[in-house]
Amino acid sequence: MMDSALYHPRIFFAHSFINGLYSSPRFANTCWRLVSRSSWEIKASENSDRNVFDENPVRKTDGSLFDSASFETVDAEITPETDDFFVSDAEGDPDCPTQGYSSIELALQALRKGKFVIVVDDETGDVEGNLIMAATLTSPKDIAFLIKNGSGIVSVGMKKENLERLSLTLMSPEMEDEDSSAPTFTITVDAKSGTSTGVSASDRAMTVLALSSLDAKPDDFRRPGHVFPLKYRDGGVLRRAGHTEASVDLMILAGLRPLSVLSAILDQEDGSMASLPYMKKLATEHDIPIVSLTDLIRYRRKRDKLVERITVSRLPTKWGLFQAYCYRSKLDGTENIALVKGNVGNGEDILVRVHSECLTGDIFGSARCDCGNQLDLAMELIEKEGRGVVVYLRGHEGRGIGLGHKLRAYNLQDEGHDTVQANVELGLSIDSREYGIGAQMLRDIGVRTMRLMTNNPAKFTGLKGYGLAVVGRVPVVTPITKENRRYMETKRKKMGHIYISDNNDQPLA
């Protein structure tokens, strides 16, 4: 039988003969099995005349079938489905705040009233939080509060056109590089009118208001000064996940002019960067909404149009005829593809696979993962259904870490790390993929409700809340091999992927 740590010995697979891969008639003609809790049913073909298997399957050294290089796909005659992915409806809603944080809507309400908001950039690692408010609504009292609880540096987030209008050049021209992650400070300024030394809360408030004025001119300011203009990068937090971009984005979303006042929050006891508990205490004491930058990114991704359709072309494949839709990201120019089978029609109950790019698995047939097998199976099942969509997302290599880092992680796995430990050892995210682009592609194609082919709860939740409803899940069940067994076991245990238990008939959560 199959060398597998995840599947019970009695579970069979009816293997599709895709890419010339070998299989076994004996293995394929075993009996069917019903998995009760999730209503999955995978059934072997009862048609012994069906010639889809290699007559000379490769054997292991001990004579058994399926050596470590075998990674066939499953032929599911009855599409396995489940209605539940063990997550709440709110979990995948981009408008639902991270636990312990305020909603973006609450923050926008506060900003419209001239109140402060705290923006935190990383709720899991080394955090940095900024107090922000609308520059156009700033008072001396607000600046005094900002100086007391912040770093003492009062900054103003501004768009490029406003900086150019006031002839505010960057302190370091090399920071003009759009790929730089560092904040882009301009020459500091003080307002000439209505100020003395420029250092008091009143003087700095006057400078902030002068920078916000539509009538302001370059000659209205002394250089250097005590207020630090910051250049906002076009695209906002969708281009650079920084506090400058977050603060200006929030002003735009609140319907205010795109100018913000901000300062990093310090611990008043020792002068260090404030911890998350410290910032939450400050927020509670002063009734200030505190929001996660991650939540703001999700909020914007739901509302902004992130892709544009470039072209549609007929694409014959080895599975059948599809229509290829090419989309270009408005954020970074990356081109993604969706393969559409049949007529989407009213967009209801569409079989969908959102597949993350995996060069090694999809193209070169790597046995380290199950990616290529999953893509093959998705194409086959959609062809059989006669109606469905495969979205292929680039930039997801190695769960978002990139090809080079993925290969470095492979070396660590060969030394004994699992796929999660390897990413952590490299100082990288376990899974940094984001599915908003894919969701918008599906919406443009016309999909409204879908049966999602995935084993990954993060993918399920990542597609919810974009005007799409996931009405069912189709597990993508592919064989386990000697090479990918530990990888898939780690995904099940540490990342919540759902497979079939090796001990019982229940789906694994």
UniProtKB/Swiss-Prot annotation:
The EC number on file is 3.5.4.25
The name this protein carries in UniProt is: Monofunctional riboflavin biosynthesis protein RIBA 3, chloroplastic
- Residues annotated as binding Zn(2+) are 358, 369, 371
Lineage of this protein's species?
Eukaryota, Viridiplantae, Streptophyta, Embryophyta, Tracheophyta
The entry's cellular-component GO terms read:
chloroplast
Chain segments annotated as transmembrane = none
Task: Say which domain of life the source belongs to.
Answer: Eukaryota
Pfam families given in the database record: DHBP_synthase, GTP_cyclohydro2
Which cofactors does this protein require? Answer: Zn(2+)
- Keyword set includes Chloroplast: yes
Q: How is the cofactor bound?
A: Binds 1 zinc ion per subunit.
The metabolic or biological pathway listed in the UniProt record of this protein is:
Cofactor biosynthesis; riboflavin biosynthesis; 5-amino-6-(D-ribitylamino)uracil from GTP: step 1/4
Q: Outline what the protein does.
A: Involved in riboflavin biosynthesis. Catalyzes the conversion of GTP to 2,5-diamino-6-ribosylamino-4(3H)-pyrimidinone 5'-phosphate (DARP), formate and pyrophosphate. RIBA2 and RIBA3 together are not able to complement the loss of function of RIBA1.
**Binding positions (D-ribulose 5-phosphate):** 125-126, 240-244
Annotated Gene3D superfamilies: DHBP synthase, GTP cyclohydrolase II
**Is Signal there in the keyword field?**
no
Catalyzed reactions: GTP + 4 H2O = 2,5-diamino-6-hydroxy-4-(5-phosphoribosylamino)-pyrimidine + formate + 2 phosphate + 3 H(+)
Molecular function terms, GO-annotated: 3,4-dihydroxy-2-butanone-4-phosphate synthase activity; GTP binding; GTP cyclohydrolase II activity; metal ion binding
Active site feature = 431, 433
Family indicated by similarity: In the N-terminal section; belongs to the DHBP synthase family.
**Transit peptide positions?**
1-43
Identify the tissues in which this protein is expressed.
Expressed in leaves, shoots, roots, flowers and siliques.
Positions that bind GTP: 353-357, 374, 397-399, 419, 454, 459
